Amino acid sequence: PTLQFRDRADLFFAGQITGTEGYVGSAMGGLVAGINCTRLLDGKAPLTLPPTCMSGALLHYITHAEPKDFQPMKANMGLLPEMAERIRSKVERYAAYAARARHDLHAYLQQVSFVPLAAD
């Protein structure tokens, strides 16, 4: 899920070649590949986003799908792990997915001491 080439940790992929489709997947892939390349150059471990956020779920899909059945994928709610409790209302369910994603991503970024660069 780091977008690194298996045989060369200093080579990163992004865009359609990774198996993502759509503008969101392409933008996310480029952003994650760029951040992870920078982290590698700084001697830090690459980010592995939690699968409970859409970016992490999409990266998890493209790295864990069966090669013989692989289909390119764009961001969609079906990629996210189910909630612990079933929520019947779509609006409430999607709000719960979003809240869980924000919480898990924030906790992960704090854990790895990720601080975005400030714009000058």
Feature names for model-found ranges:
Residues 72-120:
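C-terminal auxiliary extensions adjacent to catalytic cores
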Residues 9-14, 38-41, 80-86:
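Short acidic (Asp/Glu) and glycine-rich catalytic loops that position anionic groups and cofactors
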Residues 39-43, 63-67, 107-114:
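Generic secondary-structure signature for well-ordered alpha-helical cores
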Residues 47-70:
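Intrinsically disordered, low-complexity charged/polar segments
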Residues 31-38, 59, 102-106:
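Predominant activation on well-ordered alpha-helical scaffold segments within soluble catalytic domains
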Residues 27-49:
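Internal hydrophobic alpha-helix adjacent to the cofactor/substrate pocket in enzyme cavities
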Residues 20-28:
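Short, conserved micro-motifs enriched in small and acidic residues
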Residues 1-21, 63-78:
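FAD-binding beta-loop-beta segment adjacent to the flavin cofactor pocket
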